[in-house]
Amino acid sequence: MRYHRIIARLVLLLLIAEFLLFFLSWLLSATLTDSVHPLLSSEGIRWFLGQFCVLLLRPQLIWLILLSMAGGCVWCSGIFRPSQLSFRRQSALRVSFVVLVMLIMIVALLVMMPQAVLLSSTGRLWPSPFSRALVPILSALAIITSMCYGLLSRTFTSLFDVYDSFRIGLQQMVPFLILYLFVVMFYESCLYVFF
């Protein structure tokens, strides 16, 4: 696929930029620039290796994983594929729409009721548990709706097909996950070196 080549080039550029940053930080610290923390020092190497996993563990990583699983489920269910709708698919689409509306109503009740569970302690929507869980909520809505459609329309014949759709979604997202890893590491390295 064409976007794989673009992502591979971006990853290569980020890798080169990371190596250049290692040597640039060392060079700038050697010229007695006080505001620069070198990555090629004992402190810098300890920071880089010791914080590597901690720096990558961000909500955005979980969001990418959840969205890729939801995307795979939606794609494999065939809910958006233009095709001649049989009676079974029309019925499945109607039931899935009803399920989606019910789920949206449940989420709305968890947000709009007085002293709602998903509001912050001050009663605000942003920031709140709802705003922090927005991507997981949207992913769950997409997964449940497309799973319902897929099982009713027989594009999913078993729960293994649903599981397989998650795998397919994750497989399609792997290049973006690799790009994410390199972007976060370069960004965090720049913050360490210069700030």
Each language-model region and where it sits:
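Core transmembrane alpha-helical segments of multi-pass membrane transporters/permeases
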Residues: 57-65, 95, 128-156, 162-194
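Transmembrane helix-loop junctions in multi-pass membrane proteins
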Residues: 24-32, 79, 109-121, 148-158, ...
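Cytoplasmic membrane-interface regions of multi-pass membrane proteins
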Residues: 76-89, 151-164
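Transmembrane-helix bundle segments that line or gate the permeation/cavity pathway
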Residues: 1-84, 97-112
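Flexible hinge motifs at transmembrane-helix junctions and intramembrane kinks/re-entrant loops
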Residues: 89-97, 108-138
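Residue-identity detector for glutamine
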Residues: 51, 60, 90, 115, ...
